[in-house]
Design a protein with these regions (language model features):
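Conserved structural position at the C-terminal beta-strand
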Residues: 95-97, 202, 308, 399-401
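Short, solvent-exposed loop/linker segments at the N-terminal edge
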Residues: 32-49, 120-135, 139-144, 247-255, ...
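Short beta-strand segments within Ig-like beta-sandwich modules, predominantly Fibronectin type-III
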Residues: 70-80, 173-183, 281-288, 373-377
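Acidic, Ser/Thr
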Residues: 54-59, 132-153, 249-255, 259-266, ...
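Hydrophobic beta-strand segments within extracellular beta-sandwich modules
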Residues: 93, 198, 303-304, 393, ...
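Short, compositionally biased serine/threonine- and acidic-rich segments at solvent-exposed termini, linkers
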Residues: 180-335, 354
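Bacterial Sec-dependent N-terminal signal peptides
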Residues: 1-25
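Short loop/turn motifs at secondary-structure boundaries
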Residues: 248, 253-260, 266, 297-299, ...
Length: 422
């Protein structure tokens, strides 16, 4: 007897509450997840058909039908009762109990087995590695009630050690597991950054049946390189220093920056580069140490990067490009302050400056006696001479300075000390 039902009715029936079925066999079938578009209630993968049997879960039994890859619209009746022996191979089935039907598909693993073989590295470059497997694990499928095929994920795993950048700095090793639904002739993965072995294991069905296939390559020595870098800049909190911007890598010279780099195992050559252009055509400094500190004393834009290469130079990598901007110099002097008048308010004479790399200031009274000398523009004069506040009146400063942009300053002027009468 042949069951001829149009697909629309089948799809509707598949959505009804079913009486359900269960499968048994000498080797336990593995139930797999199905896509809703398949219209199936269940799907199983079996290890052959030895002892393969379907049972209806309701006491009344069921009428049983079989269908093929064309779909369930042309199913053929194969028996009636509480249980039935299923056919060898991959087929779809219907368990019909009154107007309720349960649709399920059985895929025979032996039709597309995962065969044993050897695993080896076929080729590798700076970004990828190809593995050759002499065995096979082809695509597996099941079919829905309208004949459409759906891929079964065999969950074949490839395990190896990788390096990952750490937030604390440097690289850490961890085991990486990639999963494949089936195997092609060549397995392509990212080029490893550390010595490792590759282990292929699977598939999920052999694993469930406690006889997984497993093969491992010999040790692989990496040629690919990667790097991870960091830059930190000196943060000065001088109230009289003008910054060039809110960016921590922009500011007033001299600006001290510390550069730190970590490179992976295959790196044989490492270098920090400082250039005046983003394309690094004009490299003004090269430093082969992974960690170094540099003080930017000249005005302008500077670009910094780290590079690493393997022993033969076939693989090279570059870190992030950092931009340091040093603003043009500025220097101006106040002409009055009031030391001792109100503590913490206008009680120190300081220049206002930006990007001053050389500084010398001398302060005199009207008789030419030197009262104070300053060699750091962030420092100031507190209005004291030999520990005592000087009297109100006019005093004089002489300044010689040089900016990061090469500009020279020769300044002189008066300083008026103001103090309210008490």
């Amino acid at each position: 007897m042949r069951l001829s039902i149009v697909y629309i009715l089948l799809a509707t029936a598949a959505l009804k509450a079913s009486a359900d079925v269960r499968l048994t066999a000498r080797v336990a079938p593995v139930e797999i997840e199905t896509q809703s578009a398949s219209g199936l209630n269940h799907a199983w993968v079996t290890d052959g058909s030895d002892g393969l049997r379907a049972e209806a879960t309701s006491p009344g039994g069921a009428r049983w039908y079989v269908f093929g890859t064309a779909g369930a619209s042309d199913a053929t009746e194969i028996g009636e009762g509480a249980a039935i022996d299923l056919r060898a191979g991959s087929h779809g089935y219907i368990a019909e109990e009154g107007d309720v039907r349960t649709f399920f598909w059985v895929t025979d693993w032996r039709e597309t087995p995962m065969s044993a073989g050897e695993l080896s590295v076929a080729s590798s470059d700076c970004s990828s590695l190809e593995l050759a497997y002499t065995g096979s694990a082809p695509r597996m499928t099941y079919h829905g009630i309208n004949g459409r095929s759906f891929e079964i994920d065999r969950q074949i795993t490839l395990t190896h050690t990788i390096l990952e950048a750490s937030e604390e700095g440097g690289f850490v090793r961890r085991e990486d597991v990639e999963s494949y639904p089936f195997l092609r002739d060549v397995i392509v993965t990212d080029a490893p950054l550390c010595a490792t072995r590759f282990t292929l294991r699977g598939d999920r069905f052999l694993t469930a049946w406690q006889r997984p296939a497993e093969v491992t390559t010999p040790d692989f020595t990496p040629t690919a390189v990667a790097c991870f870098t960091r830059m930190t800049t000196e943060q000065r909190e001088n109230s009289n220093e003008q910054t060039a911007g809110e960016d921590a890598a922009s500011g007033s010279a001299p600006l001290e920056a510390t550069f730190t780099a970590w490179a992976t195992d295959a790196a044989a050559f490492t270098e920090w580069q400082i250039a005046t252009d983003e394309e690094f055509n004009d490299i003004t400094l090269s430093e082969q140490s992974a960690d170094f500190t540099y003080t930017f004393r000249d005005a302008g834009n500077f670009f910094i990067r780290f590079t690493a290469a393997n022993a033969d130079g076939s693989c090279q990598t570059y870190g992030d490009i950092y931009n340091v901007s040093i603003g043009e110099s500025r220097l101006s002097c106040p002409n009055a302050f009031s030391p001792g008048d109100s503590e913490g308010v206008n009680d120190e004479w300081k220049v206002s400056y930006r990007s001053i790399v050389e500084f010398e200031c001398h302060i005199f009274n009207r008789w030419g006696v030197k009262l104070a000398s300053l060699t750091d523009p962030s420092h100031g004069w507190d209005g004291r001479y030999k520990g005592r506040l000087v009297d109100p009146g006019a005093y004089y400063y002489v300044i010689k300075a040089r900016g990061a942009d090469g500009r020279r300053y020769n300044l002189g002027g008066d300083i008026n000390i103001i103090r309210r009468k008490r």
